[in-house]
Design a protein with these regions (language model features):
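Short loop/turn segments immediately following the C-termini of beta-strands
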Residues: 10-12, 71-72, 119
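A short loop-to-beta-strand structural motif that recurs across blades of beta-propeller domains
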Residues: 32-35, 76-78, 121-123
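A conserved acidic, glycine/proline-rich C-terminal tail/linker
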Residues: 119-141
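Beta-rich, blade/repeat-based domains predominating
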Residues: 1-5, 28-33, 46-65, 97-119, ...
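Short, conserved, GDST-rich strand-edge loop motifs in beta-rich repeat architectures
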Residues: 7-29
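A detector of repeated loop/turn-to-beta-strand junctions in beta-rich toroidal repeat architectures
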Residues: 24, 28-32, 74-76, 88
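Short loop/turn segments immediately following beta-strands, especially the blade-tip
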Residues: 79-87
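A short beta-strand motif characteristic of beta-propeller blades
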Residues: 42-49, 90-96, 130-135
Length: 154
């Protein structure tokens, strides 16, 4: 709500030897990071540098938590607390998936449950990281970006 923009910069589209669209090239810096743009200073800062493939990202409704997915060798969701100065702390592994499934697009609903695409299904986790629902797709699809448009989300 303060105008900050939080984003990930995975290498998809430039990495070689993968069946991913885009234009192969070199990474412009030493890794895949999570960044925050500060509109007050017009600056960008790498705020998470220890994930191998940060990908999906979402803020909780009250903007006190940031959720980030890792789509590298180990697939997991990591949750951070956000303090009043917009600094991250207390990272926890929120949920983990098997190597075939990737958390990608996700969003919090009004009850702060997290709905995420995950392999060939949509999975819902409560605030404790417990899986509380799963929606299996009727046929084989690859879910990537997930947009949730229901009366459960704002």
């Amino acid at each position: 709500s303060d105008g900050s923009i939080w984003f990930t910069d995975p290498p998809y589209g430039i990495i070689h030897g993968k069946r991913i669209g885009g234009y192969p090239g070199k990474m412009q810096y030493g890794g895949c990071y999570v960044f925050k743009y500060d509109p007050m200073t017009n600056s960008i800062e790498a705020i998470v540098t220890d994930m191998d493939r940060p990908n999906g990202i979402a803020l909780s409704k009250d903007e006190t938590h940031l959720m980030i997915s890792n789509s590298g060798d180990v697939k997991y969701l990591r949750r951070y607390e956000i303090d009043k100065n917009l600094k991250l702390s207390n990272p926890i592994e929120f949920a983990r998936q098997n190597p075939k499934n990737v958390f990608d697009g996700f969003r919090f609903d009004f009850e702060d449950n997290l709905w995420t695409s995950c392999g060939e299904s949509v999975v819902c986790y409560n605030t404790s990281g417990k899986q509380i629902d799963v929606i299996e797709m009727p046929e084989r699809v690859i879910l990537s970006t997930l947009m949730i448009c229901t009366n459960r989300c704002s």
